[in-house]
Amino acid sequence: MRGQEDGFLAPLCYAPLGVSASRRLPVYYLPMARDLASLVDTLAEIVGPRHVRTALPERLTYAKDGLPTHRRVPGVVVLPGNRDEVIAIVRLLGALGMPFVPRGAGTGLSGGALADGDAVLIVLTRLNRILKIDARNRLAVVEPGVVNVRLSLAAAPHGLQYTPDPSSQTACTIGGNVAENAGGPHCLKYGVTATHVLALEVALADGRVVELGSPGGEPWGPDLVGLFVGSEGNFGVATRITVRLLPVARAVRTLLADFTSLRTAGEAVSAVIASGIVPAALEMMDQSCIRAVEDSVYAAGYPRDAAAVLLAELDGGHEAAVTADAETIEAVLRAHGARAVRVAADAQQRERLWLGRKKAFGAMGRLSRDLVVQDAVVPRSTLPDVLETIARIAAEYGLTVSNVFHAGDGNLHPNISFDGRTPGLRERVEAASAEIMATCIAAGGTITGEHGIGLDKLRYMPLLFDGDSLAAMRAVRRVWDPEERVNPGKVVPVHACREWSGVRNAEWGVRSGTSPVDSALRTPHSALDAEAGVR
């Protein structure tokens, strides 16, 4: 190996972007780490012993994300405190050829930030500084561990906000939002994370640091920011993120409409969008979800007897215009079957209505000890039929499905509550989940809107993409990470679908041939087989 001397690598120096070689940062000597102890010692030299976790109870803390289905115990957990430490860690692991997984707050819902025992988990929550708020240019520069809602709170004195608002915004980080291209209720009008990221500083798999995009937001050349956002940690580690801030709306109107059937509520969604007025948000909850919320500490005053409610919000810069739009939407809702429409009288009522929606996932924890959280997107016009089909699937499998989702853009979240200790129940849940995903795809939809592929959706990828398409995705990944060491085993299934199907079915406990997914997974994809060297 070039630079190797007596079991050590030559010293590695690096300079941050914009820093001349004469001002290089302190040098790290990187031992070959022939065993865990030497790796841990070197990591401790970089971040300090307190920030390297090797004890099993500590590592178990990071074995899951917000989705309890998957469990992976990392070999080592390291918590850098600044971007220089991140770069040093990534360079160390690159020199050693070791896999690693970047992780934020662990609120993800796809198993995307889990690391196997042979991988190092790099937890970025200590990189939590808001480096700059530029009110004049309406942008902010943040580290990846900044909690989403903190940025809006910091921007509020300037009359600005960061508009992507996932339900977990009080806990999730901007870096995690970038990895998943997170959305939220208000992405209907304002767009998902990709709409708001202007520039990124990224540590690649080998520790090289690159800048993507520009604070001015004017694109030139390939859209590498757009490629990185939503890459689920496969391309590198974002160490600094420049985002767009928008003015806080001067006028807001929030409406709650209730319906006696899911179909009617679904039809009303299309009618609202067809009116020509795009709400800031348009959310739906079904009766199961409504009752879970109303039985919890997050009770929002939703009508318990409603089959579904729509939560619609209009906002803008002029009170009269927003009021007129709200009146139009109220009329549309009533004309399309709303039993009643309530308008929040003040900010307190509005906050209460939104608290129930934002905390709905937590409230569903009351229903049973286990919860499968699904994420799919369908065309709005198909919502009535898809919702009815999901209800039929749940009934056939004897399961409870609670729907809470971003209705305005057709981003479904059918959630299945169950007790995994009941013999055979987990298998029924997974079979029902597969049928729900197949239903969404058949309706012209896709398998994720904002939660990502991660581990959870790997087995569905061949339903959407043939072998050539999957091989192309893998080729793009290899441009960023030739050895596929960054967050390995996520997003793109790298083995032949025939072989990979058996592994995944064994893990999920799904019997071959029990769902539409199994048949699809047995379809050979020659391009991917050749790519993986499978014979």
Which residues does each predicted region cover?
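Intrinsic disorder/low-complexity segments
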Residues: 1-31, 499-535
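N-terminal flexible segment immediately upstream of the FAD-binding catalytic core
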Residues: 28-91, 108-138, 167, 287-299, ...
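Alpha-helix capping/hinge segments and adjacent helical runs
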Residues: 49, 441-453, 477-478, 482-486
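C-terminal substrate-recognition/cap domain of FAD-linked oxidoreductases
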Residues: 53-63, 243-247, 253, 258-432, ...
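A glycine- and small-aliphatic-rich helix-loop capping segment at beta-alpha/alpha-beta transitions
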Residues: 110-128, 156-160, 183-194, 242-247, ...
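FAD-binding subdomain of flavoenzyme oxidoreductases
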Residues: 129-283
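Activity-critical C-terminal alpha-helical subdomain
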Residues: 208, 458-500
